[in-house]
Amino acid sequence: MKIHREGYPTILITFIIIVLINFLCFYSTKLIFIQLPILLFTLIFFYLILHFFRNPIRDVEINNKHIIAPSDGKLVVLEEVFENEFLKENCFQLSIFMSPLNVHKQWYPVNGEVIYSKNHDGKYLVAWHPKSSTENERSTIVIQTKEKQRVLFRQIAGAVARRICNYSSRGDKVNQNMEAGFIKFGSRIDVFIPKKSKIKVSLNDIIIGGETILAELYI
């Protein structure tokens, strides 16, 4: 299992704490029915941390017409909205909720140039709260395709996720097989796409980052 680089510090700290806990346990008592459950619990916990920071390699099919899912999760919002931060127009919003068991790496949804990238401080409301998109800690990235269509996606911190890693800078040339960022410990991704796009998913669908086609751009 390949581990994402964002997990290295957390994994190292967790490993040290687990070693100390088990050392103290085995040093302070000889009772096997105390030692073994603690050892088992800490090993399971360490495995879950490793599993959270897994970094799967996916065969992303690059297609200029496709808007691919930037993350794993479940599609919890699919509606027409007015995007107020940058696009300033009506568009479709697709929101993907990530549980702690999902892969938390993000991919770019389209090919093009990053024309906007901004990090916002904020609250830590639960990721499914309607106001989390505008009030939580978040990063907003806008990509303009060669056909001048713009797709905005937003990394949103949740009640557990307290760190967003945004790898985008204005002027970057990006494509769909490139890594866009990482969010630690559960959160949400909002994607805002042109109204003329043809939606290819339905509400409550299970989404696979880098593979699921959310929509097709009108070209």
Predicted ranges, named:
Residues 1-219:
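Contiguous, well-folded functional domains in the mature portion of proteins
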